[in-house]
Amino acid sequence: MKNKIIKKITGLFGYKLVEKDYIKNIRAQSSNTALNIKNLLNNYCEKNKLRSLLQVGANDGERFDELNYFIKKYKIKSVLVEPINKYFNELKKNYSNYEFVKIENSAISVNNEISYLYMVSDKNINRYDEHVKGINSFEIQHLIKHGVKKNNIEKKKINSLSIQDLIKKYNIRELDLLYVDTEGYDGKIVYEFIKSTKLKPIIIFEFFDIKNNFFNKLIDLLNDKKFKFFAISENLICYPPEKDFLI
């Protein structure tokens, strides 16, 4: 009865609690089907077509990470972005022997609208499954709908910069893959990237937590720019025709 009341209340404000088993099941099936991100990336790397990438929301570079293996094996020139200091430090350590990998300790923000993130506090992190380490978000409700208690959440100030400034900072002139996992902010980053740059990489981003009105706007932009796209699990895979991603 208590859970039903909570779900009704959150529903009134446009939020929906996400069942943990649902998320786990989605990830389990997506990693074991023939058409999954790992197989697509492996095929692309074997053809030597993935030589540079930008990952926004890299976390520690290991937890739920699709790119670590490929970056290291194929020596892919990479810029990895992670705003949370403790995960940034783990990320640096993870790639310390790979000089072709650059790491940025910032969040990517549109119009400087993000200066903090919500996360499970260190003293409460062990109360939850491993996945909560990867659900840090600019919206507190994102954590709550994943089952995190409000009094277990802390708000931390972070550095941020725009996608344009990031590209200038690392002199990114060619890009084969943009991979975004920012727990709800993905759509804005991808939209701003497409609108403000001439780069046309393969783009992979989570779309489950994007508001429907904005997602439709993003789909219109992808169509306008002639991107093709399809969904795998909670991710949308987008590619310009010249990339031949599925061949």
Description of each model-found segment:
Residues 1-247:
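Phosphate/nucleotide-binding beta-alpha loop and adjacent structural elements of enzyme active sites
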